């Protein structure tokens, strides 16, 4: 569930910080706050995002998305070149033929459309302050949403569940990683 996923990341980052791996983590920088022990989503409009970029002196923005096999991808842009039109219309920053399950080489121009509600400052990049937004993926030339965009698939499934009488559902990945104190391996 997405809510638990984000709260879990926050807890893990605090643990890693206590072990000296990362800079400090401020709860307000993540897209969820924990209020009364319950994760609560922070919602942003496009105007809120641009105000936050200016207020927090963000230098770079990671435009993030996933492929069908579940691999997390991103492309980074300079925050000072990011415009409200790009937030509204998307950015032609993706060659779909290079992402497994997206498109063929002859139809590869895709558009990343940032979701302002997914805006979050990346707390472990302190020197060149960065933020991220998850993106929806569209075909170029106004041809609509990419059918194999995992976010789009989840959104369609969520809408279908609503038509079946379910009020609420939670969707999202679970990020897994390991931190080792020591690693040893033999090389032939």
Language-model-derived ranges and their functions:
Residues 3-4, 8-17, 21:
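Short, positively charged and aromatic/hydrophobic N-terminal segments
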Residues 20-188:
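ATP/Mg2+-dependent ligation/transfer catalytic cores
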